[in-house]
């Protein structure tokens, strides 16, 4: 590149520096930097010249050029010659000082240039800067800034000049009056001092190692004098901060005696500024530097300033941190650093100041002080070593503070103490207890808002930090092990530490394991030496009980069990082996569940089994008694945890059951009865469970103790008449009685069965009844307390169940049975019949269920009362509650219903005869006929249950008639059509059971399965659907089954019952009765022959009435008989029915399809009527020039509707199959010629008004009607798969519309080929006569249909290929372009359907396709597009010699389409180009290779095409082009980057491609660049942006020898135009390309 070209390139970029888009401007700067990387001197000179010549250029753009120069200089300054460096230094100096005003961006950029040059030419830069320092005159602020920056960037180069600089600056310090100038001086002095300190700290690398601090001390002190005594007094806060920042590093350079002399003024001066400045970080940082300097010189003055320093610093640390800004947080760190300096120099004075402040009640003061204490404990450990006792004693008051912030700070201090040995001192245990207390804080008391800087609210909570601290201290601080063990054990049992159990257990487990590793002696606890520790019994009970709620407290169950397992040597020496086996099983069970999935009862039973096994292994009565005593003592601890207290009662019962001492057992039982909190329901239940478990081993003692308690003074006081009204409330007495009644119930339920029967009536029930009713003044008073009632019912239920489950139940005579049943029924009747609030009626019915099974049997009236009372109590309840109404309510409802079912089956079991069954059904009959659906559903469900039970337990000893079969079937069968689905299902089950009962009474075995009866089960699915047609069809089938299995003698009773059902208030059931009556008449009407005419007549007359649907089958039958004699007349008369057809007419049409022969005759007549008339008539209603409207003719339309109705009947199937080809072709042509056809005006008006309820709801629109009929024909002919495929693909909807009709015909052909292939030969034969149809729509439809058939192999398999090709070839010259296009598509489909036949027909196919490329005058003809798509499919399959002759012509013909405005043409042409390349792999002629090379650039650029399909086609084409270019690297790059579905990083890919292109095809540079120039003018922004990017990469990878191929001036000019493109992205890429052109040097 000549110098003029380089200059032109730089000039072009510099002219673009004024672009308004910041990204473009940044890219221009980057391009300039690229030029500078290659040609730094020329680029820098061009920039210098540009700035010099454009003196009026605005300062933002001057700054941009200067920044570009700085970036070049930062890496290429070493390549500058002295003259260039001098020129740049002068330019930057001039730019920097051109204006005296502060223009920071511009002056900063110029300063940056000087600093960059100064790294290499420090002397020249310093010379220029010193030249700008005029004696007695204030320097420019930018000069000061540059000197400061140089001091940091090149300290070794600047520091030797410092004396000269300072000598020039110091005299004018006093002259500086403006605050901005003074700030600049302060910044410079700060940087000078920092540079000097760096120089002095690294003298071994310094150019002059003889430099000492004294060289600067005098000048620095002079500057200090001005800064401190004059400028620090300024009112400008920014200046004061700048002064303070400078004083910090300057203090290290002051002479020692001067620093000592100035400290009394300096320190108060700095401290005073704390009150004036909000941002105190710089003050604290500088103060820390001054303190370090003072300490380093051993200042004595510091001692006198200490009080003021501590007070000021303490006030800073106590300031609330309201912001999480870095400066605020950094200030805290700097203040603490100051405290560290003071702690190391004056520890006593520091503690004397800090510790008294811990006693203050002010939150900020206490938190800040604690923060400092923690810091000095960690940072000045050596100085604090002998101060530990004082620090510990000072924590007394902070430990009592309830403020959460103070608590957090205290916990952090204790953590620091633990690491440094404080907690081993006297008083350390108080700290540990404090941590445990904080671990026990309840979660609900945690602060909701996080502290400053906290991302997770929980992470900073007092409890969370305490838990972490306790665990870390226990596990990581070895010296704490002997302090915490076994001390932490004493926190396990107190209630106030319950919340800390989980962290306590985890820490204790870790400590215990460490002790075990140290040896048995170290692990075993000496309880004599640790009197405050809980006993082994207390620990065992506590840990076992809290494990019953294992997921509370962050999983305390698992933690407690692990601790219990680890402590086994300290619990009892025999437990080791057993606990090591069982505890892991319990832990594994917890791991398998969550809090939501854990079955609580099962878990508690596992724990109780663990306890029982443990007691059995110990087998020491004294130990067991001691454990029971401890468990009883712990009862008050769980008053606020009812579930755990309930479990504790169970543990007590289990432990007492294992005890052998009767005295201990009775004593503890007495104490439990006396101390129980009877007002709590959970406690009453727990107490009862305890007595029940204890009774397993001590029945006599348990009952005796209950008797003793009743006779005791405590109990008698509670029930005395005076106490009822005075001392105690009646409610309290009822609670005590409830508990006692429950105790007796649980004793009966748990005690051994062989012992309990003898006690039931004499002891247990006597006491239960005695406690339930009380006599006052000789009068029996019944309780009103529902809780007491429920306890009575529960206990009686448990007693009854115990009797029933006993092996001696059969011989047991229960004398109080009738009394108890009456009592239960009284409770049931007392419950509200419309709501279910308590489980009383459920429990009472369950009790009755058990009582019914016990001797003696109930009399008939009592049985009836029980059944009637329970049904009335349950059946009228509102429907089953939904889940959202409450899971408990739904559960109670279901359980109550199950209790009723169990009771009824128990009663039926006592009378297993047809009469007994009928009695039960008679009780249910009113509910079966109830007008309320939920009552019918329940009644049918219960009936089905009873019938199933009766059938399962049927025992027939002799053949007897089931005399009430017809009556019962007549009651249930109409319910198969009930509005409630559940009722319908249950009705079928009832009929099913009744039929099998009849078979049983006929002598068939119980395992016999009747085929007819079994069909009922398969019909149940049909009853799920609410569709009446399906429902009544199922009812008809049920009627057929009944008719086949009903004995002749039962027919009359059944019919009579059915006729009664016609008046059923539930209309659906009435209709079902009609359906079943008709079925019975058809199947069994022989015995009622004289009644048939009358019945048919009645049903036909009902058809004319509004509610005559139930007689419709009879009317249909009549029409059928008429049609068998006069088919043509019936068809003609029905076709005259007005459109749209009403529902009665539709049903009559369907009746004609009952018999296949008649159906075929009817279909033939309808086809004839449809084909006879024209499908539509054209009408010009308004404007003469308007396209005429097409209006459907009535006769074909009526015939179409009739065809649909006839074929919608299943019986029409054989007739439809017989006429399949004719029906399919006629209906397909009907569809094609009705697209866009309108209804006659009168029918349109009816459609707008809406059909009446009696009219069919089917769409009458001509095309939709034809499509529906075609679909119905396919369904009826067995082509369901075709219909399903069309449904899934939306084919039917496409057929209905003008825009989608062609695609709909295509999809129909595809579905036919796939699922109805054998039908096609006859269909095509019928279609043959339609090729020359006068209707264009019909030609398009048939061509689309035929074209798609070639897409399937069915054409070849059925030997239809030749005929299809001939049919399509004949249409190549059709006047309709759509037909010609579809012909090409069909020919191309041969590639998919019969690929092996393509070679045979190759010339014919290629000729047609190539001819299609030139179809018509329109270059963008859809026929041409179809030809390209077809060629892409065929080229791989034809013979290569057939393709060669047209290959070049095709490539040339499709090339213009690459840049077509139409996306479809771009996609098709590019993809075809890829296929042509694929075919030519390894055998590419030169003329075609030239086309490949010519297409390379367009393909690469269109990868950025706005249309994704075009970009995808380019990916494919490039992958195919790769092998033809004979460059493995390029081909590999195409394969790697351009795979489908892989994200393309276009820049990276283009860079790689250009590298390979230029390496292997260097001669293509000019040609490729010329193509790029063409795309500079592309209408697509992305492509226009890709072109200069492509250009830049080509140039980047080119070699200098390729320069002759490039017209650089033309390229620069074109890119210069792009720099003015409206799209920022294009301008950015153009600038980037210009930066790359430097490569052509």
Curated annotation (Swiss-Prot):
Keywords: Lysosome, Membrane, Repeat. InterPro entries: ARM-like (IPR011989), ARM-type_fold (IPR016024), HEAT_Maestro (IPR055406), HEAT_MROH2B-like (IPR055408), HEAT_type_2 (IPR021133), Maestro-like_HEAT (IPR048465), Maestro_heat-like_prot (IPR045206), MROH2B-like_N_HEAT (IPR056282). GO terms for biological process: lysosome fission. The gene is MROH1. Coiled coil: none annotated. GO terms for cellular component: cytoplasm; lysosomal membrane. Homooligomer; homooligomerizes at lysosome scission sites. The keyword Transmembrane helix does not apply. PANTHER family: MAESTRO HEAT-LIKE REPEAT-CONTAINING PROTEIN FAMILY MEMBER 1, MAESTRO-RELATED HEAT DOMAIN-CONTAINING. Lysosome fission factor. Recruited to lysosomes by RAB7 (RAB7A or RAB7B) at scission sites and homooligomerizes to mediate the constriction and scission of lysosomal tubules. May sever membranes by inserting amphipathic helices into one bilayer leaflet. Lysosome fission is required to maintain their steady-state number, shape, size, composition and function, and to accomplish regeneration. Belongs to the MROH1 family. PROSITE patterns: HEAT_REPEAT (PS50077). The keyword Cell membrane does not apply. HEAT repeats lie at residues 3-41, 159-198, 344-382, 385-423, 1048-1086, 1358-1396, 1605-1641. This is Maestro heat-like repeat-containing protein family member 1. Its main location: membrane. Pfam families: HEAT_Maestro, HEAT_Maestro_2, HEAT_MROH2B_1st, HEAT_MROH2B_C. It is found in: Lysosome membrane. GO terms for molecular function: membrane destabilizing activity.
């Amino acid at each position: 590149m000549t110098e003029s070209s380089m200059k032109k390139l730089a000039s072009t970029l510099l002219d673009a520096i004024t672009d308004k888009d910041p990204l473009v401007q940044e890219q221009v700067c980057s391009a300039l930097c690229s030029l500078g990387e290659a040609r730094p001197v020329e680029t820098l000179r061009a920039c210098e010249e540009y700035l010099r010549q454009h003196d009026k250029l605005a300062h933002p753009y001057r700054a941009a050029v200067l920044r570009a120069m700085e970036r070049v200089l930062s890496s290429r300054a070493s390549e500058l010659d002295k003259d260039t460096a001098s020129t740049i230094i002068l330019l930057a100096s001039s730019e920097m000082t051109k204006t005296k005003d502060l223009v920071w961006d511009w002056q900063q950029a110029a300063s940056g240039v000087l600093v960059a040059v100064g790294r290499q030419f420090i002397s020249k830069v310093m010379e220029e800067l010193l030249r700008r320092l005029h004696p007695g005159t204030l320097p420019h602020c930018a000069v000061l800034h540059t000197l400061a920056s140089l001091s940091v960037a090149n300290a070794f180069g600047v520091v030797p000049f410092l004396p000269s600089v300072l000598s020039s600056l110091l005299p004018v310090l006093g002259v500086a009056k403006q605050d901005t100038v003074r700030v600049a001086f302060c910044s410079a002095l700060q940087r000078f001092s920092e540079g000097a300190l760096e120089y002095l700290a690294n003298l071994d690398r310094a150019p002059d190692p003889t430099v000492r601090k004294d060289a600067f001390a005098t000048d620095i002190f002079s500057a200090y004098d001005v800064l401190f005594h004059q400028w620090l007094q300024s009112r400008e806060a920014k200046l004061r901060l700048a002064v303070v920042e400078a004083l910090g590093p300057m203090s290290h350079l002051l002479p020692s005696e001067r620093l000592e002399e100035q400290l009394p003024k300096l320190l108060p001066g700095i401290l005073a500024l704390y009150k004036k400045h909000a941002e105190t970080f710089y003050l604290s940082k500088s103060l820390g530097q001054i303190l370090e300097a003072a300490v380093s010189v051993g200042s004595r003055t510091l001692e006198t300033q200490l009080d003021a320093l501590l007070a000021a610093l303490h006030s800073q640390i106590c300031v609330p941190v309201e912001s999480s800004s870095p400066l605020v947080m950094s200030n805290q760190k700097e203040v603490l650093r100051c405290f560290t300096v003071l702690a190391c120099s004056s520890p006593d004075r520091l503690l004397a100041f800090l510790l008294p402040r811990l006693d203050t009640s002010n939150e900020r003061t206490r938190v800040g002080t604690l923060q400092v204490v923690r810091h000095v404990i960690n940072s000045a450990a050596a100085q604090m070593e002998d101060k530990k006792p004082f620090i510990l004693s000072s924590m007394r008051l902070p430990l009592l503070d309830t403020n959460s912030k103070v608590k957090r700070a205290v916990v952090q201090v204790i953590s620091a103490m633990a690491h440094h040995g404080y907690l081993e001192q006297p008083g350390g245990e108080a700290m540990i207890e404090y941590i445990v207390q904080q671990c026990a804080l309840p979660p609900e008391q945690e602060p909701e808002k996080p502290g400053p800087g906290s991302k997770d609210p929980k992470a900073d909570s007092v409890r969370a930090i305490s838990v972490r601290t306790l665990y870390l201290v226990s596990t990581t601080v070895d010296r704490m092990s002997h302090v915490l063990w076994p001390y932490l054990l004493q926190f396990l049992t107190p209630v106030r530490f319950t919340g800390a159990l989980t962290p306590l257990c985890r820490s204790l487990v870790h400590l215990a394991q460490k002790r075990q590793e140290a040896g048995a002696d170290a692990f075993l606890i000496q309880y004599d030496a640790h009197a405050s520790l809980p006993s082994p019994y207390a620990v065992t009970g506590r840990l076992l009980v809290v494990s019953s709620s294992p997921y509370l407290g962050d999983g305390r169950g698992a933690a407690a069990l692990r601790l219990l397992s680890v402590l086994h040597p300290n619990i009892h020496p025999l437990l080791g082996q057993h606990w090591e086996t069982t505890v892991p099983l319990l832990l594994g069970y917890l791991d398998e569940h969550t809090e939501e999935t854990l079955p609580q009862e099962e878990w508690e039973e596992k724990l109780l089994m663990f306890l029982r096994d443990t007691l059995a292994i110990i087998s020491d009565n004294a130990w067991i008694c001691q454990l029971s005593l401890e468990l009883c003592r712990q009862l008050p601890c769980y008053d606020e945890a009812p579930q755990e207290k309930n479990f504790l009662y169970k543990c007590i019962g289990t432990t007492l059951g294992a005890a052998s001492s009767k005295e201990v057992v009775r004593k503890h039982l007495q104490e439990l009865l006396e101390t129980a909190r009877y007002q709590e329901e959970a406690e009453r239940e727990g107490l009862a469970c305890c007595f029940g478990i204890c009774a397993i081993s001590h029945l006599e003692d348990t009952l005796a103790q209950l008797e003793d308690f009743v006779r005791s003074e405590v109990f008698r006081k509670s029930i005395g008449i005076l106490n009822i009204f005075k001392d105690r409330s009646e409610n309290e007495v009822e609670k005590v009685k409830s508990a006692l009644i429950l105790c007796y119930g649980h004793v009966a339920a748990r005690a051994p069965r062989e012992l309990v029967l003898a006690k039931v009536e004499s002891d247990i029930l006597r006491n239960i009844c005695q406690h339930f009713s009380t006599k006052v003044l000789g009068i029996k008073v019944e309780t009103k307390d529902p809780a007491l009632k429920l306890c009575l019912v529960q206990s009686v239920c448990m007693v009854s169940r115990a009797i029933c489950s006993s092996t001696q139940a059969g011989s047991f005579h229960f004398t109080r049975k009738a009394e108890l049943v009456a009592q239960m029924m009284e409770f049931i009747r007392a419950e509200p019949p419309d709501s279910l609030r308590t489980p009383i009626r459920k429990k009472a019915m369950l009790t009755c269920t058990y009582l019914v099974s016990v001797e003696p049997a109930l009399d008939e009236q009592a049985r009836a009362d029980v059944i009637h009372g329970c049904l009335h109590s349950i059946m009228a309840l509102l429907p089953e509650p939904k889940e959202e109404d409450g899971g408990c309510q739904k559960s109670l409802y279901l359980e109550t219903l199950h209790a009723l079912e169990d009771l009824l089956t128990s009663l039926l079991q006592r009378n297993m005869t047809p009469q007994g069954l009928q009695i039960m059904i008679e009780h249910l009959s009113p509910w079966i006929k109830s007008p309320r659906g939920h009552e019918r559903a329940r009644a049918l469900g219960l009936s089905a249950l009873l019938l199933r039970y009766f059938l399962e337990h049927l025992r027939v000893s002799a053949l007897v008639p089931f005399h009430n079969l017809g009556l019962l079937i007549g009651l249930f069968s109409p319910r198969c059509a009930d509005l409630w689905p559940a009722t319908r299902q249950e009705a079928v089950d009832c009929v099913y059971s009744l039929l099998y009962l009849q078979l049983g009474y006929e002598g068939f075995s119980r395992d016999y399965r009747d085929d007819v009866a079994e069909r009922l089960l398969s019909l149940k699915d049909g009853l799920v659907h609410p569709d009446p047609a399906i429902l009544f069809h199922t009812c008809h089938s049920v009627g057929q089954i009944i008719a086949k299995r009903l004995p002749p003698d039962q027919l009359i009773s059944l019919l009579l019952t059915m006729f009664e059902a016609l008046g059923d208030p539930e209309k659906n059931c009435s209709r079902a009765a009609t359906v079943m009556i008709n079925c019975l008449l058809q199947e069994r009407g022989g015995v009622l022959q004289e009644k048939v005419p009358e019945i048919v007549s009645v049903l036909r007359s009902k058809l004319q009435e509004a509610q005559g649907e139930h007689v419709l089958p009879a009317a249909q039958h009549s029409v059928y008989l008429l049609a068998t004699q006069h088919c043509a007349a019936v068809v003609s008369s029905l076709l005259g029915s007005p459109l749209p057809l009403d529902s009665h007419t539709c049903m009559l049409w369907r009746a004609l399809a009952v018999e296949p022969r008649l159906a075929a005759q009817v279909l033939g007549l309808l086809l004839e009527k449809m084909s006879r008339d024209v499908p539509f008539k054209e009408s010009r209603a308004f404007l003469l020039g308007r396209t005429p409207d097409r209006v459907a003719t009535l006769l074909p339309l009526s015939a179409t509707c009739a065809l649909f109705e006839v074929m919608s009947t299943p019986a029409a199937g054989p007739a439809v199959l017989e006429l399949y080809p004719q029906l399919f072709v006629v209906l397909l042509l009907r569809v094609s010629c009705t697209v866009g056809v309108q209804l006659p005006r009168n029918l349109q008006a009816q459609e707008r008004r809406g059909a009446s309820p009696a009219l069919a709801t089917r769409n009458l629109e001509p095309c939709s009607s034809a499509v529906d009929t075609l679909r119905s024909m396919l369904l009826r002919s067995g082509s369901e798969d075709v219909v399903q495929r069309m449904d899934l693909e939306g084919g039917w909807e496409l057929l209905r519309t003008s825009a989608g009709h062609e695609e709909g015909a295509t999809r129909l052909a595809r579905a036919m080929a796939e699922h109805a292939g054998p039908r096609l030969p006859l269909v095509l034969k019928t279609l043959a006569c339609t090729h020359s149809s006068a209707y264009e729509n019909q030609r398009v439809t048939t061509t689309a249909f035929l074209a798609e058939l070639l897409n399937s192999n069915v054409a070849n398999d059925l030997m239809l290929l030749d005929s299809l090709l001939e049919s399509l070839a004949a249409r190549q010259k059709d006047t309709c372009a759509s037909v010609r296009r579809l012909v090409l598509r069909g020919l191309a489909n041969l590639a998919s359907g019969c690929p092996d036949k393509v070679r045979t027909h190759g010339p014919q196919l290629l000729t047609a396709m190539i001819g299609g490329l030139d179809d018509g005058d329109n270059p963008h003809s859809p026929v041409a597009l179809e030809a390209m798509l077809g060629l892409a499919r065929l080229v791989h399959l034809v013979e290569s010699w057939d393709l060669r002759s047209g290959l070049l012509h095709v490539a040339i013909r499709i090339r213009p389409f690459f840049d077509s405005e139409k996306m479809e043409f771009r996609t098709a042409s590019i993809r075809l180009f890829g296929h042509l390349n694929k075919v030519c792999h390894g055998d590419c002629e030169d003329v075609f290779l030239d086309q490949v090379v010519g297409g390379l650039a367009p393909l690469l650029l269109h990868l950025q095409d706005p249309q994704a399909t075009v970009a995808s086609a380019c990916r494919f084409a490039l992958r195919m082009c790769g092998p033809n270019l004979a460059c493995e690297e390029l081909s590999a790059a195409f394969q790697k980057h351009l795979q489908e579905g892989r994200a393309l990083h276009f820049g990276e890919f283009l860079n790689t491609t250009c590298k390979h292109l230029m390496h292997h095809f260097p001669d293509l540079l000019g040609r490729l660049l010329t193509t790029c120039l063409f795309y500079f003018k592309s209408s697509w922004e992305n492509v226009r942006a890709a072109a200069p990017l492509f250009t830049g990469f080509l140039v980047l990878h080119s070699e200098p020898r390729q320069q002759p191929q490039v017209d650089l001036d033309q390229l620069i000019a074109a890119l210069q135009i792009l720099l003015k493109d409206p799209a920022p992205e294009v301008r950015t890429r153009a600038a980037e390309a210009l930066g790359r052109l430097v490569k052509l040097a």
